[in-house]
């Protein structure tokens, strides 16, 4: 009620120390120390051009091996990056090597163009643009 004065709680230092200790341990459990930082891939990056006459911007920097490996890996084709197809479209043509070694001497499958004297003559006429009809 409004008319009654509140009872004053006697502060117990041991009890206060225990409460502070629990708060401190709770904060330590929820805190996380971030030591690795990276660029957010969902955020647009604004490029700032360097000053052309600045001496510290024109120093040669050593190549970062990890970055170069990432770039070279990204430039490879999917068959060199992955052991198997990653999508349905990649499955078509994933194994593009011939299953059977082609036998070039087998005339049942290989029909090579053979030239004789008359076919060479006619091919030369056609390449020069001459018409084979009589006038």
UniProtKB/Swiss-Prot annotation:
Disulfide bonds: none
Compartments where located: Cytoplasm, Cytoskeleton, Cilium basal body
Top-level taxon: Eukaryota
Main location as per UniProt: cytoplasm
Keywords of this entry: Cell projection, Cytoplasm, Cytoskeleton
Matches recorded under InterPro entries: CFAP144
Membrane-spanning intervals of the chain: none
Keyword Cytoplasm: yes
A GO cellular component annotation in the UniProt record: ciliary base
Residue numbers spanned by region Disordered: 77-97
Family under the similarity heading: Belongs to the CFAP144 family.
Name of this chain's protein: Protein CFAP144P1
Organism encoding this protein: Homo sapiens
Chain's gene name: CFAP144P1
């Amino acid at each position: 009620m409004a008319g009654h004065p509140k009872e004053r709680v006697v502060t117990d230092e041991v009890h206060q120390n225990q409460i502070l200790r629990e708060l401190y341990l709770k904060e330590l459990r929820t805190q996380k120390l971030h030591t690795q930082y990276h660029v957010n891939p969902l955020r647009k990056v604004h490029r700032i051009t360097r000053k052309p006459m600045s001496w510290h911007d024109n120093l040669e920097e050593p190549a970062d091996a990890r970055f170069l490996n990432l770039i070279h890996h990204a430039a490879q084709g999917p068959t060199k990056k992955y052991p198997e197809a990653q999508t349905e479209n990649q499955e078509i043509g994933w194994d593009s090597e011939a299953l059977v070694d082609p036998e070039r001497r087998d005339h049942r499958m290989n029909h090579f163009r053979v030239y004789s004297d008359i076919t060479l003559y006619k091919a030369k006429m056609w390449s020069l643009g001459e018409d084979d009809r009589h006038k």
